[in-house]
A protein has these predicted regions:
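Active-site-adjacent loop/helix segments that line or gate small-molecule/cofactor pockets in enzymes
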Residues: 55-59
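General beta-strand structural signal in soluble alpha/beta enzymes
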Residues: 49-53
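ATP-binding/phosphotransfer module of carbohydrate and carboxylate kinases, centering on a glycine-rich
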Residues: 1-6, 16-21, 38-47, 61-71, ...
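Structural signature of FAD isoalloxazine-binding scaffolds in flavoprotein oxidoreductases
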Residues: 100-103
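Active-site glycine-centered loops adjacent to acidic/histidine catalytic or metal-binding residues
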Residues: 54, 80, 245
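Short glycine-aspartate micro-motif
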Residues: 4-8, 74-78, 84-86, 117
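A charged helix-plus-loop insertion that forms the helical arch/lid used to bind
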Residues: 20-33
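Short glycine-rich anion-binding loops that position phosphate/pyrophosphate groups of nucleotides
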Residues: 12-15, 80-82, 202
Length: 253
């Protein structure tokens, strides 16, 4: 412990970064709200502690040592079981008044949409997450993948079949990409970033996902916002959050 200067913690949920406390979970994790993460570590180790949302940490990691290095205005969206993300503006992490800004999975894109775990309807992650894509295929499993049981359908299987020329699945993926696009275009029009960074396992599908997404984004975005706009995949994978937690502790962002 003598060599430690502090603890940088990447945590899931809505994190009050000022207090180091979990302030919300969007209905995902029982008994996590109001956990005083920072105080627990301070009481045990008597060292500085910072606690930040895991998606915000991923953004800071990528800005420090990854695909977003050198950029000062960045929107990052992580696509997986849900949707996470973070926003860097003029080189600083956007945290909001209580440190919980950037809950990108839970802005509604459909007023009469599906019920979300957060209690709202039509949330972005209900249509733009990998879970959403899997559910789209499962709902039509008898038609789209009659040789596979619904329980065995996942994102990897879907993209493998699209890469092998499955046009029906490609159409479903295109519809899903449009949902992702609509949310990202809104964020681009609000924040005017230099870079939109896409994280999550699906981000490694350059030809089947990133390139079609890029084309759709530029087709929907107003021309002035497209100037110098870059859209690309994150680089650091699961290490991004760990590196970002250290970066925040070191006051780099």
């Amino acid at each position: 412990l003598a060599e430690l200067s502090g603890f940088g913690i990447s945590a899931t949920g809505q994190i009050d970064t000022k207090e180091g406390v979990v302030s919300g979970t969007a209905g995902h994790i029982a008994n996590w709200i109001q956990t005083p993460i920072a105080q627990i570590f301070k009481d045990s180790y008597h060292l500085p502690v910072s606690v930040v949302n895991d998606a915000d940490c991923a953004l800071m990691g990528e800005c420090w040592l990854g695909a977003a290095r050198g950029y000062r205005d960045v929107v990052m969206v992580t696509i997986g079981t849900g949707i996470g993300g973070g926003i860097l503006t003029e080189g600083r992490l956007l945290t909001g008044v209580r440190g919980i800004a950037g809950e990108l999975g839970h802005f509604p894109i459909r007023a009469d949409g599906e019920l979300c775990s957060c209690g709202n309807r039509g949330c972005y992650e209900k249509y733009a997450s990998t879970t959403a894509l899997v559910n789209m295929v499962r709902d039509r499993a008898d038609e789209l993948v009659p040789d596979i049981s619904a329980d065995h359908i996942d994102g990897q299987l879907i993209f493998n079949r699209v890469s092998q020329g499955d046009t029906a699945l490609r159409s479903v993926v295109s519809e899903w990409i449009t949902s992702i696009t609509l949310g990202l275009v809104g964020l681009i029009h609000i924040f005017n970033p230099q870079l939109v960074l896409i994280g999550g396992g699906v981000s490694q599908q350059e030809d089947l996902f990133i390139e079609p997404l890029r084309k759709q984004i530029f087709s929907y975005t107003m021309p002035g916002f497209c100037k110098d706009l870059i859209i690309k995949s994150a680089q650091l994978g699961n290490n991004a959050g760990l590196l970002g937690a250290v970066a925040y502790l070191k006051n780099l962002f």
